[in-house]
Amino acid sequence: MQTIYTKITDIKGNLITVEAEGARLGELAEIERVDGRSSYASVLRFDAKKVTLQVFGGTSGLSTGDRVIFLGRSMEVTYGESLIGRRLNGVGKPIDGEGECFGDPIAISTPTFNPVCRVVPRDMVKTNIPMIDVFNCLVKSQKIPIFSSSGESHNALLMRIAAQTDADIVIIGGMGLTFVDYSFFVDESKRLGFADKCVMFIHKAVDAPVECVLIPDMALACAEKFAVDHNKNVLVLLTDMTAFADALKEIAITMDQIPANRGYPGSLYSDLALRYEKAVDIAEGGSITLISVTTMPGDDITHPVPDNTGFITEGQFYLKNNRIDPFGSLSRLKQLVIGKVTREDHGDLANSLIRLYADSRKAAERMSMGFKLSNWDKKLLAFAELFETRLMSLEVNIPLEEALDIGWKILAQSFHSEEVGIKEQLINKYWPKSCLHR
């Protein structure tokens, strides 16, 4: 039996306080307004009989005489095959004009997957982006962010990864998006040809903060059902996790919580970890691979959001000057696939290329300071130009095997075989034959 409460004692921001009994944290409530409209709210805290709820869609138009009905369940999202190809908002309602989604309601904010049923990641996710495939491999079930400054093309990178991987289903969770960003996701998914296997959960910048917080939970709840029930390999793309953290901060401030670092709530680490830990490779089942975008205000890597994220995830891609910076990027799972599911020369070649490129940066610094350059410095600078053009540029779109072959060609065009520090048996097998004795 549902109990109706009519005594709203306080309205502040997107929060209301009502005198009620028996409410649970996270419980969903329906607010019936005196004008006949209704909206939903979620329980954030309670103190004796005073229950504080966050109202979806804001409190504009609410009055203290509105009726509050506690539904006895937490927030749910519709799950089913009809979800594929659809776009929904932060409360799970369609926004694409295609009518209602049909399926079974499933709870969000569920616990992470049972560790006993997880398996060690073993498969590579190929993206056709050399700076990922060659140097920091993306592994199935990996959780990894893209650290990006404002103005970088991180959304374009996300869409390219979505289009070029072999994931069965792509789920995009957009948080704090402008209309331009939202339109870009819709148009690019159609242009790149994966709209028919894509689900989008969209929170726009003008929507309520609580809807922003729900976006990752909805996306990951659906991803887990697809992976468990249908053995699907699901790629989840979340952008922007800084907007997610800002929504948490706004809610915490409204609730008069004591802030921690730079105003963010003290629970920021656990709030982020709860979402990232949903990435999983399921024994005899599907998988969830999670890539997020975390923008760094002021290009500050020590900002609380990227700083906490780095302790949770299995590496990061550092997007800088519209390139994936090899020195700021890391994949902690790449050793599980390099040389095991890729070519035998992969590891040695990648290490040699990065080492020589690091040396070229030192040579470029010496040149900028007016030092006389040695012949070796000149070789390094010539190598760096080829490396940046043929491998580092995000415009390069080639399979892993071709990228490895290009890496060998770049080395052969710039150095003698004995100068690159690669094992002789690999030199004899992969060094371009026309340059074998250089």
UniProtKB/Swiss-Prot annotation:
Tree of life domain: Bacteria
Annotated GO biological process: proton motive force-driven plasma membrane ATP synthesis
InterPro entries xrefs: ATP-synt_VA_C (IPR055190), ATPase_F1/V1/A1_a/bsu_N (IPR004100), ATPase_F1/V1/A1_a/bsu_nucl-bd (IPR000194), P-loop_NTPase (IPR027417), V-ATPase_su_B/beta (IPR022879)
Family matches, as Pfam families: ATP-synt_ab, ATP-synt_ab_N, ATP-synt_VA_C
Keywords: ATP synthesis, Hydrogen ion transport, Ion transport, Transport
GO molecular function: ATP binding; proton-transporting ATP synthase activity, rotational mechanism
Family membership noted in the UniProt record: Belongs to the ATPase alpha/beta chains family.
Function in brief: Produces ATP from ADP in the presence of a proton gradient across the membrane. The V-type beta chain is a regulatory subunit.
HAMAP family: ATP_synth_B_arch
Protein name (Swiss-Prot/TrEMBL): V-type ATP synthase beta chain
Protein's organism: Chlamydia caviae (strain ATCC VR-813 / DSM 19441 / 03DC25 / GPIC) (Chlamydophila caviae)
Gene that specifies this protein: atpB
